[in-house]
């Protein structure tokens, strides 16, 4: 239902969806920027959380993992230097240690993550985020 209007950069009024949509966003990531652009083009009001500055807490990460049906390593960027430095490929590390590693080193969290009405999508590819709006 369209019930809110916003002005575009050109000054045009466009309808905005009134639903709670949150994106865990890294403005330096092309996939994250693409996902945010798709949400904006769809007319969705988006709460942007720059997760490198404001990382999610353990409860939030655990909730995201449960909703995506993923294990912690599946939400981690294994190509990041920090992943290797912390030896996070060690299979003896338990779930809590991996989640704590993401909190303390948010660069390890795969992005973007979009949450809408208790549904979660990882924006890989970016178009996947449109499935939940």
Regions of interest found by a model, annotated:
Residues 19-38, 42, 46-49:
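Local sequence-structure signature of Cys/Sec-based thiol-disulfide redox active-site neighborhoods
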Residues 51-133:
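Thiol/selenol-based redox catalytic cores and closely related redox-interacting motifs
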């Amino acid at each position: 239902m369209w019930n809110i209007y916003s002005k575009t950069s050109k000054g045009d009024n466009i309808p905005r969806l009134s639903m709670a949509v949150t994106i865990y966003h890294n403005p330096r990531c092309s996939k994250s920027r693409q996902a945010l652009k798709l949400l904006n083009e769809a007319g969705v009001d988006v709460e942007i959380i720059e997760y490198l500055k404001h990382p999610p807490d353990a409860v939030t990460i655990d909730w995201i993992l449960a909703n995506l049906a993923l294990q912690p390593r599946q939400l981690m960027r294994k190509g990041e230097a920090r992943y290797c430095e912390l030896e996070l490929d060690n299979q003896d590390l338990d779930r809590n240690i991996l989640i704590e590693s993401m909190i303390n080193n948010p660069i390890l969290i795969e992005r973007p993550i979009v949450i809408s009405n208790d549904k979660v999508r990882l924006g890989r590819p970016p178009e996947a985020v449109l499935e939940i709006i």
